[in-house]
């Protein structure tokens, strides 16, 4: 059972419901926002930030989804690991590809750029102090400075809010 009460949609702030398209999402897709809805103004800011990360994204959806799923594994966020986002699926994310994330550096169906981004995400999630000049030099082989900043902000979002979601223990809707 979740450790924070999930608000029913009827109890959400009207603007937050609209911003998040909550009425069209499944409970799994609504995710932690069901708890965040207790603080609607803060949640609107979070939604705006998350929306900006997605709407202004220059990185491929496939790469972002691969990094998200690998970070979710390290966060041990069961709901984060269970969900599959449509934009990632439309950009080539399959369950076979997801299985490659068990040992991503050995996977032959991941590009070198994807492996570099996944490695960065893994280190950010597990040992951020190990992210050194060599890691950034490797990222620069595949990504511009602005793409590296975008990746960094996206990974920070995944790590922080994935851990928060894991701590809420939202497992009721999991397959």
Give the ranges of each region predicted by the language model.
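Hydrophobic alpha-helical segments
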Residues: 1-175
């Amino acid at each position: 059972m979740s450790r924070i009460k999930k608000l029913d949609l009827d109890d959400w702030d009207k603007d937050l419901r609209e911003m998040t398209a909550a009425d069209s999402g499944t409970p799994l897709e609504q995710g932690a926002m069901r708890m965040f809805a207790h603080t609607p103004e803060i949640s609107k800011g979070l939604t705006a930030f998350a929306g900006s990360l997605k709407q202004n994204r220059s990185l491929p959806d496939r790469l972002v989804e691969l990094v998200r799923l690998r970070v979710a594994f390290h966060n041990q966020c069961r709901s984060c690991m269970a969900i599959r986002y449509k934009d990632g699926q439309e950009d080539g994310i399959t369950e076979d590809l997801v299985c490659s994330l068990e040992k991503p550096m050995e996977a032959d169906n991941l590009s070198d750029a994807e492996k570099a981004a996944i490695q960065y995400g893994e280190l950010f999630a597990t040992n951020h102090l190990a992210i050194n000049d060599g890691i950034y030099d490797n990222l620069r082989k595949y990504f511009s400075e602005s793409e590296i900043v975008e990746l960094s902000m996206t990974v920070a979002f995944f790590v922080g809010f994935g851990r928060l979601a894991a701590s809420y223990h939202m497992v009721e809707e999991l397959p």
